[in-house]
Amino acid sequence: MHHDKRCKESNMKIVKAEVFVTCPGRNFVTLKITTEDGITGLGDATLNGRELSVASYLQDHLCPQLIGRDAHRIEDIWQFFYKGAYWRRGPVTMSAISAVDMALWDIKAKAANMPLYQLLGGASREGVMVYCHTTGHSIDEALDDYARHQELGFKAIRVQCGIPGMKTTYGMSKGKGLAYEPATKGQWPEEQLWSTEKYLDFMPKLFDAVRNKFGFNEHLLHDMHHRLTPIEAARFGKSIEDYRMFWMEDPTPAENQECFRLIRQHTVTPIAVGEVFNSIWDCKQLIEEQLIDYIRTTLTHAGGITGMRRIADFASLYQVRTGSHGPSDLSPVCMAAALHFDLWVPNFGVQEYMGYSEQMLEVFPHNWTFDNGYMHSGDKPGLGIEFDEKLAAKYPYEPAYLPVARLEDGTLWNW
């Protein structure tokens, strides 16, 4: 009886679970869970270009099954939604579960009166190294952008560049300031042209120009966005070894995991993969066969804190480090949670950081700080992020889609 009484006293009953879709420049899906004590938790469920599917999954299926549950029982709730649906994994399901998990960790940390990273086991480092994005229509423009970010103090810098003879430049911002937004508003995605031959010929010239001008002081990163075949990626990785890249990201579509063996046979350029992954099962082979160096899974798409902890712990056995996806199509709620996770996780590598527009940060008041290339979550209890519902309501959902790519002959390709 005494044990039952103790359990009941520690029970933190969920009384409300609400879903908000707001577009302060771009669409975000936010879950807010409230307990009977009035403690609230926030979770991010944003899935770029498929936001309403996740919002419906939460609103129609998960939220009703949260009411009356004990918010402390995070693991049980995670398993209930993962196993209980019967249909497992996939981006919509896992983004919804991720938001629930994030919100429950926010609540638990607030109830404990601790910032989340303390609850996870405390800080493993003083700050979180983040990498920024730089690009330009030409090499000169890209070098100018690099210099600007170097002056801001970034220690890790991603470089992209327009390729002569191609109309569109991957990585060019449509948003204001640091808020990069590749999605185009409207009912139809933008179609972009891609030429692997032009890319392979030109891109090493960019890295050469960067290293010649700025030296090797910063970590240099590059995203290939799934566009090369395995043998092309092997050739490319080998050709850029002298530039000592921190990583080449998504060199080829990762569904065919065996093909990374071919890339590994030919190059020691480090490889980062996983932003489109949704569970540890997507990562398992690449990690245990040492086919990658950084795992790019993110809290919003891979099962929240609970899912990401499993992935990171497994990766640590093989000295694979985290390099979480973090563009501005994940909301500030995810960024806040990621910084707590990054402060704690022993096998941390780097965190992607793109910044947000003022509009976005007004809707999501935050507590993190950036100082000379490193970020910190702050020490407020929970995630240290808030959500202004009234302001969010002024920015209703607007259809927007990521681009698609076609080869010069019209064949649909990987964007």
Swiss-Prot record:
By its UniProt entry, which InterPro entries does this protein fall under? D-mannonate_dehydratase-like, D-mannonate_dehydratase_GalD, DgoD-like, Enolase-like_C_sf, Enolase-like_N, Enolase_C-like, Mandel_Rmase/mucon_lact_enz_CS, Mandelate_racemase_C
Gene Ontology BP, a term? amino acid catabolic process
Keywords, sorted A to Z: Lyase, Magnesium, Metal-binding
Q: Where is this site: Important for activity and substrate specificity?
A: 327
MF GO annotations: magnesium ion binding; mannonate dehydratase activity
> What SMART domains does this protein map onto?
MR_MLE
The cross-references to PROSITE patterns, in alphabetical order and at most eight, read: MR_MLE_1, MR_MLE_2
Q: List, separated by semicolons, the cofactors it needs.
A: Mg(2+)
What's the record's note on cofactor binding? Binds 1 Mg(2+) ion per subunit.
- Does Magnesium count among this protein's keywords? yes
What EC number(s) has UniProt assigned to this enzyme? 4.2.1.-, 4.2.1.8
Q: Where along this sequence does the record place binding of substrate?
A: 48, 133, 275, 296, 325, 329, 352
| Active site (UniProt) | 170 (proton donor/acceptor), 225 (proton donor/acceptor)
Q: Where does Mg(2+) bind?
A: 223, 249, 275
Catalysed reactions, semicolon-separated: D-mannonate = 2-dehydro-3-deoxy-D-gluconate + H2O
Concerning its family, UniProt says: Belongs to the mandelate racemase/muconate lactonizing enzyme family. GalD subfamily.
Q: What does this protein do?
A: Has low D-mannonate dehydratase activity (in vitro), suggesting that this is not a physiological substrate and that it has no significant role in D-mannonate degradation in vivo. Has no detectable activity with a panel of 70 other acid sugars (in vitro).
Name recorded for this polypeptide: D-galactonate dehydratase family member RspA
